Amino acid sequence: MILHCNYEELGALKQGANVLLGHGRGEGFSIAAPPEGRTEVEALLPRLGGDLTIETLAEQRWVARAIQAIVESLKEEMDLFIITAHPADESAVASYFQYGHALSVLARVTEMGQEMEALIEVVTGAPPSPEVAKTFLFPG
């Protein structure tokens, strides 16, 4: 399955990943990522050059966890810019749009996961087990 992302969404995800990993604009403050979320974001970052091909439910789940961590990072960054500057400050407004774009991708990848789970259940007659989540392939 393909998760389509536009230019703004990819930019927001990259920015959020860099903030979460301690690079870029957010270097001046700390946003704590759990080690699992950090590892998943590091693995996702090189794939953020275009649409994402997701072949298994297990892959969708780790991509969703990485994007969730990015969204949380962008939300914290947005809150910080609003509190330290002003809601109408340029950095606060820009961070709002970054957060919104990433949140839109999170909603789509979550919906994709629900559709994948439903399709697996229809085909196999049972909810997806961890093994099936890793081995049931979806076309790209």
Predicted regions and their residues:
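Positively charged, low-complexity terminal tracts
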Residues: 1-140
